Swiss-Prot record:
Originating species: Neovison vison (American mink)
UniProt subcellular location: Cytoplasm, Cytosol; Cytoplasm; Rough endoplasmic reticulum
GO biological process: cytoplasmic translation
GO terms of molecular function: mRNA binding; structural constituent of ribosome
Principal location class: cytoplasm
Protein name: Small ribosomal subunit protein eS26
Family membership: Belongs to the eukaryotic ribosomal protein eS26 family.
Keyword Ribonucleoprotein: yes
Keyword Ribonucleoprotein: yes
Keywords tagged on the record: Cytoplasm, Endoplasmic reticulum, Ribonucleoprotein, Ribosomal protein
């Protein structure tokens, strides 16, 4: 399989689980480390 990026677009690493956050310009629930901080409401 191709792998887009090594960290899957997240800042997690050794953490195992991060709580989702209501995120970005869309009202989607996204893991806290994956949400682009610019748009976080």
């Amino acid at each position: 399989m191709t792998k887009k990026r090594r960290n899957n677009g997240r800042a997690k690493k050794g953490r195992g689980h991060v709580q989702p956050i209501r995120c970005t310009n869309l009202a989607r629930c996204v893991p806290k480390d994956k949400a682009i901080k610019k748009f976080v409401s």
